[in-house]
Amino acid sequence: MTIALGRIPKEEKDLFDTVDDWLRRDRFVFVGWSGLLLFPCAYFALGGWFTGTTFVTSWYTHGLASSYLEGCNFLTAAVSTPANSLAHSLLLLWGPEAQGDFTRWCQLGGLWTFVALHGAFALIGFMLRQFELARSIQLRPYNAISFSGPIAVFVSVFLIYPLGQSGWFFAPSFGVAAIFRFILFFQGFHNWTLNPFHMMGVAGVLGAALLCAIHGATVENTLFEDGDGANTFRAFNPTQAEETYSMVTANRFWSQIFGVAFSNKRWLHFFMLFVPVTGLWMSAIGVVGLALNLRAYDFVSQEIRAAEDPEFETFYTKNILLNEGIRAWMAAQDQPHENLIFPEEVLPRGNAL
């Protein structure tokens, strides 16, 4: 019997399949569909920040020097927020404010909106990158879910908070000293340290640092020995196939130290994921509250008693007075466009704050 085989027709790839193959090809640095968002946005955000901190002044928006060109250093340079009069304008280069003039756009604070928006999309692109890569190699998506914590903080602080206030002016500028100034502003105008969401955020971040230190030390302490080297890195083979440390020994140690210990690796590592991510999300929720000018804890009874009795004072009432000093001093310096003038008797005296 003769069987005649015709040619098997090749399936023609359309443009989408061709692009998909190229984007998801196995290479040293994975690109993926998420890379179409991540790489351009990260490039523009970082490029805008380096350009702003090197060349662009904040004289027209804040009355400050903020670039290396003006004599700032790495800690004091910043890409500062637009002027308060520009409210929530996107400050597009071709918009009615700059009208295509790049120099004017920089003077008005256009680089800040450029860096903030591209930075936000770059972070989202990085999270999508983790989703995409995890899906392609059949991992669970907890890395991407965890990264939602930093994204929530960035979006709430740099975008949602100023949207709730009068303009981008009240967002943090992109610089080290500028962020410190913003923290002082948050304390003076919102009493942020006494906000329960801030407390949960601090507990989450510092608790995560403690968990990392404990976990790393415990694993190092309970490694199975498979060599006679004099130190950790020579005595243990990094390619060993079997389990690398003793969970049973670790459990026994911490049971004796605390009376309780994790007996299950999955629960232990989920807890290490849960603590910092929840802390960051709580902080983000708190900042959204501040955008709406929600107040922190107020212990009014202590304030009234302190006002009536000169001998009564608590750490809380002292902090309230400090906040008043921050507001009185900062408002006039920070918002020169408001022409705020405070009577001498209400201002803090000299350096003896």
Swiss-Prot record:
Chlorophyll a PD2 binds at H198. Its EC number is 1.10.3.9. Disulfide bonds: none annotated. Chlorophyll a ChlzD2 binds at H118. The D1/D2 heterodimer binds P680, chlorophylls that are the primary electron donor of PSII, and subsequent electron acceptors. It shares a non-heme iron and each subunit binds pheophytin, quinone, additional chlorophylls, carotenoids and lipids. There is also a Cl(-1) ion associated with D1 and D2, which is required for oxygen evolution. The PSII complex binds additional chlorophylls, carotenoids and specific lipids. InterPro entries: D1/D2, Photo_II_D1/D2_sf, Photo_RC_L/M, Photo_RC_L/M_CS, PSII_PsbD/D2. It catalyses: 2 a plastoquinone + 4 hnu + 2 H2O = 2 a plastoquinol + O2. The chain crosses the membrane at residues 41-61, 125-141, 153-166, 208-228, 279-295. A plastoquinone binds at H215, F262. It is found in: Plastid, Chloroplast thylakoid membrane. Its main location: plastid. The modification Phosphothreonine is found at T2. GO terms for molecular function: chlorophyll binding; electron transporter, transferring electrons within the cyclic electron transport pathway of photosynthesis activity; iron ion binding; oxygen evolving activity. Photosystem II (PSII) is a light-driven water:plastoquinone oxidoreductase that uses light energy to abstract electrons from H(2)O, generating O(2) and a proton gradient subsequently used for ATP formation. It consists of a core antenna complex that captures photons, and an electron transfer chain that converts photonic excitation into a charge separation. The D1/D2 (PsbA/PsbD) reaction center heterodimer binds P680, the primary electron donor of PSII as well as several subsequent electron acceptors. D2 is needed for assembly of a stable PSII complex. PANTHER family: PHOTOSYSTEM II D2 PROTEIN, PHOTOSYSTEM II PROTEIN D1. PSII is composed of 1 copy each of membrane proteins PsbA, PsbB, PsbC, PsbD, PsbE, PsbF, PsbH, PsbI, PsbJ, PsbK, PsbL, PsbM, PsbT, PsbX, PsbY, PsbZ, Psb30/Ycf12, at least 3 peripheral proteins of the oxygen-evolving complex and a large number of cofactors. It forms dimeric complexes. Belongs to the reaction center PufL/M/PsbA/D family. 2 of the reaction center chlorophylls (ChlD1 and ChlD2) are entirely coordinated by water. This is Photosystem II D2 protein. The gene is psbD.
